């Protein structure tokens, strides 16, 4: 090494990163960022200072495709060197047609391919003594909660969805690896784990629920056994994307025991048997209502969230009203709904009798108006109750927290009027003073 080179060592390469899409994509981004930091790359907060930019895209619906393509274009304009990954990356021709100058394109869950592309265009720094990576990896979420992905892909072929064609069939992570990651997160200060996958309740079915090992003891690769083990960490464990298999009923006693949060994110999608069959979804709303009653009997505090599609091809007014009747009887706590939108490659596109957009929108508004009344009534009974909440943010006006019934970003929040002694990540015991459609207002106890 010459004197000049020792005085002016090579600059550490910087990578810009943009993460779009759902929590599953967020976990993919976290894995790539963790690898980058482990190899000594710096993460640039802006395009200008980056040597190249990675864009993790979403391609689920048309608006997501448009946002992804726009973001790629922005990164090319501001930086010029862009690597594309994620769900839209499974359609390389779409990306290349819009932006032929991108350096490389990979599909989702392709950490090794992304890193190989980065190495090719921006060689990694050489400093074996530099330890940049915390044990829990690089996270895009606040320090007190984290998403934990337990599998990739999906074995279902719902006619409105193209995720299996982008992310492949179900591949479950080894149960020991999942629990090791959970332990690392807990040791790093995480107080809430949000368990995610394309189909959380199918965990282990691809490997016939093979028995794995965790700290020397056997644990089946199955959602009930995994949930039971996660419950031993003594933190909040929240389940998302739970397909309504019969064995989901086994999870409710764990919620009643306090091992899992009494919260179930379970997408029913519709209530009419014919529409559900066209969707290739479970088609027995009567059985669903019986199960909901049993869940509430076993765990009275359970909060139920679901999603629904309105205006699916062929949906009649009577079939839509059947969905409204189901919602009235089910009395779900949280509901998300959207109008059916044709997605390139989805089997439902070829179904006859597509519902006109204006009728779709009218039905969506009717559904949400009805559900708002239900949600408001279900929250109103909490007035005067005491709750333990997890604080997300604090400012001069107070604190914003979440209860067991509130997942980050998709549900309501809990406002605390006095935040003088609180900081993000704190637990707080509060009393509910007021409620509305989605949120609670509280005072510290």
Curated annotation (Swiss-Prot):
Cofactor binding, per record: Binds 2 [4Fe-4S] clusters. One cluster is coordinated with 3 cysteines and an exchangeable S-adenosyl-L-methionine.
Annotated ranges, domain Radical SAM core: 140-377
GO cellular component, one term: cytosol
Protein's cellular compartments: Cytoplasm
Pfam families membership: Radical_SAM, TRAM_2, UPF0004
Family, as annotated: Belongs to the methylthiotransferase family. RimO subfamily.
Name this protein carries in UniProt: Ribosomal protein uS12 methylthiotransferase RimO
Species of provenance: Nitrosomonas eutropha (strain DSM 101675 / C91 / Nm57)
């Amino acid at each position: 090494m010459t004197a000049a080179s020792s005085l002016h060592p090579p600059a550490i390469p910087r990578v810009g990163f943009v993460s779009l899409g759902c929590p599953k994509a967020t976990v993919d981004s976290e894995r790539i960022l963790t690898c980058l930091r482990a190899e000594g790359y710096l993460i640039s907060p802006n395009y200008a200072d980056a040597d190249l930019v990675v864009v993790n895209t979403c391609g689920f619906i048309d608006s997501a495709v448009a946002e992804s393509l726009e973001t790629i274009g922005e990164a090319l304009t501001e930086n010029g060197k862009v690597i594309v990954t994620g769900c839209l990356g499974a359609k390389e021709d779409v990306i290349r047609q819009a932006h032929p100058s991108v350096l490389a394109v990979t599909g989702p869950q392709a950490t090794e391919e992304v890193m190989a592309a980065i190495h090719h265009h921006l060689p990694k720094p050489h400093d074996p003594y530099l330890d940049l990576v915390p044990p829990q990896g690089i996270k895009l979420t606040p320090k007190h909660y984290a998403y934990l992905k337990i599998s990739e892909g999906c074995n279902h072929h719902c006619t409105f969805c193209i995720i299996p064609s982008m992310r492949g069939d179900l591949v479950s992570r080894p149960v020991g690896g999942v629990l090791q990651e959970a332990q690392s997160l807990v040791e790093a200060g995480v107080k809430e784990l949000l368990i995610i996958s394309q189909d959380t309740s199918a965990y282990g079915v691809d490997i016939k629920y093979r028995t794995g090992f965790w700290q020397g003891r056997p644990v089946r690769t199955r959602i009930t056994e995994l949930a039971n083990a996660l419950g031993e960490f003594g933190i909040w464990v929240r389940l998302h994307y739970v397909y309504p298999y019969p064995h989901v009923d086994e999870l409710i006693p764990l919620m009643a025991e306090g091992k899992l949060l009494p919260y179930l994110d379970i997408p029913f999608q519709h209530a009419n048997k014919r529409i559900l069959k066209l969707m290739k979804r479970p088609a027995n709303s009567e059985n669903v209502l019986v199960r909901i009653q049993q869940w509430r009997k076993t765990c009275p505090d359970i909060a139920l969230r679901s999603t629904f599609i309105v205006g699916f091809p062929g949906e009649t007014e009577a079939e839509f009203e059947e969905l409204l009747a189901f919602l009235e009887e089910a009395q779900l706590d949280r509901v998300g709904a959207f109008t059916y939108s044709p997605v390139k490659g989805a089997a439902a596109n070829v179904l006859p009798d597509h519902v006109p957009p204006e009728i779709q929108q009218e039905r969506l508004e009717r559904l949400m108006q009805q559900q708002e009344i239900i949600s408001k009534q279900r929250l109103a009974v909490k007035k005067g109750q005491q709750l333990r909440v997890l604080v997300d943010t604090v400012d001069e006006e107070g604190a914003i927290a979440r209860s067991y019934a509130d997942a980050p970003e998709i549900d309501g929040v809990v406002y605390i009027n006095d935040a003088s002694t609180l900081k993000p990540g704190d637990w707080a015991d509060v009393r509910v003073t007021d409620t509305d459609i989605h949120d609670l207002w509280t005072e510290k106890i």
